[in-house]
Amino acid sequence: MRDDTCDYLSLFLNDTPLLDVRAPVEFAKGAFPGTTNLALINDEERHRIGICYKQHGQQAAIDLGNTLVCGEERERRLYAWQQWWQANPNGYLYCFRGGLRSQTTQAWLREIGIDAPLVTGGYKALRRFLIDEMEACIANLPLEVLCGRTGCAKTRVIEQQPNAIDLEGLAHHRGSSFGRRPGGQPSQIDFENSLSIALIKQRAAQPVSILVEDESKLIGRCHLPFSLQDQIKSQPRIIIEESLESRVQVTLEDYVIGPLQEYARYFGEHDALKQLGDELLASMDRIRRRLGGIRHQQLRQQLQEALAVQANCGNTELHREWIHSLLADYYDPMYDYMLSRRAGTILFQGSRAEVSAFLNSR
């Protein structure tokens, strides 16, 4: 029989399976990577029990819960937990504070012979632990910042380095006005939880430094912690420099060719290009004010023509026109301004291949 645990660090370092028995509405606001939500009480039941608790006290609320979740419904939920536990025998369960819902779930499982240890303090304690660890890691771990103009394939370099944290991957967003991906983004709490876990795993590996991409305060709608924003502005930099032609090719792959495959997985082959085209046009419209009316109209027209050719024969070459203009006239001046405001020492500067070789040599 395993004991309940308060070793939160071990849970996250080992990717321990976690069963979240909170209501779906609570889970949607914030959870942990890989956690499974099989609620003891659903949203409506939670609402009714909460009102009962406020009006009549704990015992009345418990009695109402037992009335709402009984018979076949109780057996259905118990069976779902049983199936999960058989697949994850080293797991732990938790509710919000590690209290009555966890203990009730634990007791029901014990009735059918399953030892189900819980996380002491529940979700609230785990969340507090991750917030504290995230801030400690940001303050104490040595960071290096990978910089470069749009299309330098910074994310590809990040993905190849074992001591790197892919912030855009955690945010499920490519980090620009055109960076939205099908499936949407995690909640802010989910993003922070994933970031904290990535940081403590890097700390455990004891790298010489941790590499992150030069990001603004927002990756899509995910907000970087203020402390990390400050570190990105001040820590040593590694700069990738690539020709405009090379960056146009990478941007074509990252904005058009690669995303089309993603959209096909979400919406099917038939609707993928329309969905992607609508998103690209919406992205162009979102930066209309910064582009200016005439330039926005020109780029939008080029994009529409490129999408029409692609729909007709599958050729993506015409996309290079609007991408070239977008990089040269919009993203490059913005990047040059931002880079001029960075204070960190430049550790290395070179092509993507040279930067990768530099990183791999250490």
UniProtKB/Swiss-Prot annotation:
User: Where do the catalytic residues lie?
Assistant: 95
**Residue ranges of coiled coil:** none
- Family membership noted in the UniProt record: Belongs to the SelU family.
Q: How does it assemble?
A: Monomer.
Q: What Enzyme Commission number(s) does the record list for this chain?
A: 2.9.1.3
Q: Mind listing the GO molecular function terms for this protein?
A: transferase activity, transferring alkyl or aryl (other than methyl) groups; tRNA 2-selenouridine synthase activity
Q: Name one GO biological process term.
A: tRNA wobble uridine modification
Annotated function: Involved in the post-transcriptional modification of the uridine at the wobble position (U34) of tRNA(Lys), tRNA(Glu) and tRNA(Gln). Catalyzes the conversion of 2-thiouridine (S2U-RNA) to 2-selenouridine (Se2U-RNA). Acts in a two-step process involving geranylation of 2-thiouridine (S2U) to S-geranyl-2-thiouridine (geS2U) and subsequent selenation of the latter derivative to 2-selenouridine (Se2U) in the tRNA chain.
The Rhodanese domain covers 12-135
Which SMART domains does the UniProt record give?
RHOD (SM00450)
Q: What is this protein called?
A: tRNA 2-selenouridine synthase
PROSITE patterns from the UniProt entry: RHODANESE_3
